[in-house]
Amino acid sequence: MAKAIIDIETTGLNPMEHRIVAIGVKLGDRDIILMDESEYYLLVNFWDTVEKEGIEKIIGFNIDFDWQFLKLRSLYHRLKIKHFRKYQGRVDLRQILNGSGGQYRKGTKLVDYCRFLGIDVPEDDANGSEIPELWEKFEEEGDEEAKRKICEHLKRDLERTWELYKILVDCGLIEE
């Protein structure tokens, strides 16, 4: 069974009002970063990648947020999600670490857990709240540096989530 770390970047927090601008997929040592000015084609490429790579287990930090966006934005574009039910068993690292249904509490962001566990988080690292502004710069001004920053942020989050996942497996909080 192929497993993948999934992370998305969006223009906001509400999938009924905001869009996905980038999707990251980590398969072992391989990172796949998908970005397209058309959200429709971005999602088509994502679901094609999931099928082509045989991904059956989706893992992420606060993956329920990502999944809700992927599901509703695909629905908005009338895209078929093949094998929808098998992804309902996704692994949400935030829920495992937070307990209590994974509800947000101060100090429970990915970077907080990474710093706590010694996973590298540079002080000058971009954070998700900067993505809408970066996307706007790219979309309206063609700012390639803004696009690069979104991709780099996504790659770093994929790597951190993978490192966190490995620690949780090693410590027995997740069984493979």
Curated annotation (Swiss-Prot):
Protein name: Uncharacterized protein MJ0365
A family per Pfam: RNase_H_2
Family annotation (InterPro entries): RNaseH-like_sf, RNaseH_sf, YprB_RNase_H-like_dom
One MF term in the entry's GO annotations: nucleic acid binding
